[in-house]
Amino acid sequence: MTEGKWAIAHIYSSFNNTLITITDLTGAETIAKISGGMVVKAARDESSPYTAMQMAMQVAEQAKAKGIVGVHVKVRAPGGNKQRSPGPGAQAAIRALARAGLRIGRIEDVTPIPHDGTKPKGGKRGRRV
């Protein structure tokens, strides 16, 4: 794992959009970043797995051009008061990064989890289905 430069791929995936940012190992310098809206025109397609795949391919090309050989992946969902499961684009993005020729180090879930934060929406009796 020592040969070549490694980076961190931050993948934020919700049901509305997917964002991929590649930074150096400290997280200070941004190497490449992209969002669903930069790839597709329709807002409904921003979170789709196909869009995430296209985004990952573009970001991987930019990273490889700057000498990155592998990435550690940090997957994040909206978290907090919102859903804690990543959207449909997360898994597709990780697969596409691997297929684009980048080595995958460790995959980590960094979804923010509240330690009894704000009140969830839905009122006193919750969401009645």
From Swiss-Prot:
Positions of the UniProt region annotated as Disordered: 108-129
Molecular function as annotated in GO: rRNA binding; structural constituent of ribosome
Recorded GO CC terms: ribonucleoprotein complex; ribosome
GO biological process terms held by the UniProt record: translation
Pfam families given in the database record: Ribosomal_S11
Keywords: Ribonucleoprotein, Ribosomal protein, RNA-binding, rRNA-binding
The organism's place on the tree of life at top rank: Archaea
InterPro entries: Ribosomal_uS11, Ribosomal_uS11_archaeal, Ribosomal_uS11_CS, Ribosomal_uS11_sf
UniProt family annotation: Belongs to the universal ribosomal protein uS11 family.
Subunit structure: Part of the 30S ribosomal subunit.
Function of the molecule: Located on the platform of the 30S subunit.
Protein name: Small ribosomal subunit protein uS11
